[in-house]
From Swiss-Prot:
Belongs to the YME2 family. The chain crosses the membrane at residues 282-302. This is Mitochondrial escape protein 2. It is found in: Mitochondrion inner membrane. GO terms for cellular component: mitochondrial inner membrane. Pfam families: RNA12, RRM_1. One of its GO terms (molecular function) is RNA binding. GO terms for biological process: mitochondrial genome maintenance; mRNA processing. The keyword RNA-binding applies. Plays a role in maintaining the mitochondrial genome and in controlling the mtDNA escape. Involved in the regulation of mtDNA nucleotide structure and number. May have a dispensable role in early maturation of pre-rRNA. Residues 174-266 form the RRM domain. It is a single-pass membrane protein. CDD domains: RRM_Yme2p_like.
Amino acid sequence: MRVEDHCSVFAWSSLQASRPWPAAGRYASLQAGEDKTGHISAGPNEGILFFNNVFPIQIRKIMGLPMPRILDRLISPAMSGTDPNTVIQRAKAKRNLPIESTEILPRVREGGAFVKFTHDGSTPTSEIEKTLQEYLRDEPVKPWWSPWKRMRAKVVKGRPWVEDMMRLPAPRLRVEFVPGEPGASVTEAVDLSQEQLFQFFRPYGKLSDIVMQESDSKVLPKFAYLDYSSIGKAIMAKNCMHGYLVSEAEGGGKKGTFLRLKYEQKIKPRYIRDWIINHPRIIIPIIAALIAGTVAIVFDPIRTFFVKAHITRTLHLEDNKWYKWIKGYASDIIRGHKRDEDDSYDAIWDDRKGNIEQIQTWLMETADTFIIVQGPRGSGKKELVVDQALQDNKLKLVIDCKPIQEARGDSPTISAAAAAVGYKPVFSWMNSISGMIDMAAQGATGMKTGFSETQETQLNKIWNTTTTALKQIALERRHKDDRDANLADDDWLEAHPEHRPVVVIDNFLHKSHEGGIVYDKMAEWAARLTTTNIAHVIFLTNDVAFSKSLSKALPDRVFRQISLSDCSPDVAKKFVVTHLDADVEDDPAPKDGSEKKLPSQHRTDLAELDSCIDLLGGRLTDLEFLARRIKTGETPNKAVNEIIDQSASEILKMYIFGAEDDGGRRKWSPEQAWMLIKELAQKESLRYNEVLLDDILKTGGESALRDLEQAELISIISGPNGRPSTIRPGKPVYHSAFKRLAQDKVLKSHLDYAILTNLTKIENATIDKCENELLLLSKLRNQPAQTAGRVQYLLAKLSASQVKVEKYETEIKGLKKVMAEED
């Protein structure tokens, strides 16, 4: 139900029975004019007045909504004092106004009401209008909801259209010029001039502008726009002048011209919005800068807080002393006061005590350089540094490069880097969205907006925030009453290396061949930490070529380096035995009073340990694996054989087969890997340059060796001057695994067959090249004597290659026979 149809608002006759107001039904019928025709007619001695300010115009904004009864009463003319009938009665009493109101048609949407009246005919309507206006001016009627605007009244000159459609008033009126005779062509209507329109419409209020239709416009009927200074004035003009017939005397032509009025919603000029839309090259970078500034102001302190909490482990429950006490007490009850298996590492740490003390000494010095701990995978680098050298240092940040480097795509890489340092919140997914926005904006404006950020930029943000957090942590140990309290922050940090946090970067250069931007940025960041004395930086790496990458960040520094090797046989045996005894060493003695024996004392098969360790080697992870298998009840020999078989299977999968599954990232061929396996099965080490002379390594041999070293099939030992000199198995257990693989006749025949086939292709290519050159020389006229030497050289080379081909084919026949007969 619309507001205008809500009879309870306007059932004014119920408020005062004596008033000549229509009943509710009569009122409802008048909303669309008499007999719902949309018009009001006035007969002889009748007229129509339009009163404004009867209802609040703003009520139009909630048209069509159900209105509460209290609002009906508040805006009721009887409550607000704007009842037109009451106004007329007072004017009659005080000014002898000679009219009688007969019907009232309220126009809630327009805030006014039509009043139909009768008079005796002796007084013209212009005098009636003048008298009523003087009364309203001398005794203004101001409703409570508009105390600054008084009620006004005008005689309706036209034939008002009282439609009940949802059309809202506006300060602009569209005046259409329609011919005065029905059925006449619209072109017969007269276009009134601005002066004429001003004369007709200025009495209803101040006009801001009159806009005439463009002369070349073909829109019919012709029209003009009237812009009033307020909506109220436009409402008054529209209701009083709609349907007015401009006579010939007034300039309306012979047949006259009707004025048809309607509200026109004027499009307001939005200069600021238009300027913003029309200048994207200026606005978009400004918006990007504002967003970046807001993010920096809001999120940077939060991120710094979380990074500090990650380093100091403030929010980690497991580091709380009470939690540790409860956990330790509960563990003792559950495990029965058994020793921790980590105690078995004591033998290792005793052997590497010098390395531990060396790292601790370096951390007390001011030298602004890196500390590098290099060793093969599984040699215990992280345990040595984090669990031993930094055992008493609570301010340490451990960053594992492996998940960062193995992440696929920019967003996962950024998320992994942020998680490593506790940087949050991180909106890595926003980079994809901002990238699309940036691309769209670049297509529209021709320039980048700066919304999107590269992976390099976002990594720099993470490292810079971490730098801020590390510096704040280091300076938290500074006190105002210190003797050197007058020093600047940078000078104080340089003078107190013992107060600097320690950053441990683990798995540095892991899979560095897949892209080095992460490692380059990390090395640059680590260089800033050390040169500004904010933190000590320790790199843990398997790569022997680490200096090439780190020298870019610190080109003028000598690195402090510790190289970890495999354990000696004595230390390895002690480690395994200690690991076996760890669980039962604290058990109570037998009740019969006999001496308690440890597993290492009553197990007779431990005599095999010496020979087993010789086969297994001293790699820490392999020794721990051996100890766990022996603890489950396996004999040392069986355990070692299982480990060797497992390593052999691993070698086949990682280095020989499965090249298709590796996505083409391998830079060595299976033949090159097998050649090294076969040679190292016979010898514990190979001479580097001698290996490069092998025919299978003639093309890209050095690159293949470096990649196989990165993949940890082999290890390349350099001499004192840094030149590669020796090739050894990547792990000690690989030597035994190589032997195991070389003893497999079918596998050996299959891979040797591939090598010989490859070598045969190489020699056949050499023969083709020699034959082509000999054919070219044979076409020379009068064979020059100078070509004789070249011909002899080519013939000798061709003959040597032919001998090799025949040899290879003979060997291939034997290999085919083995593959056909063996299972």
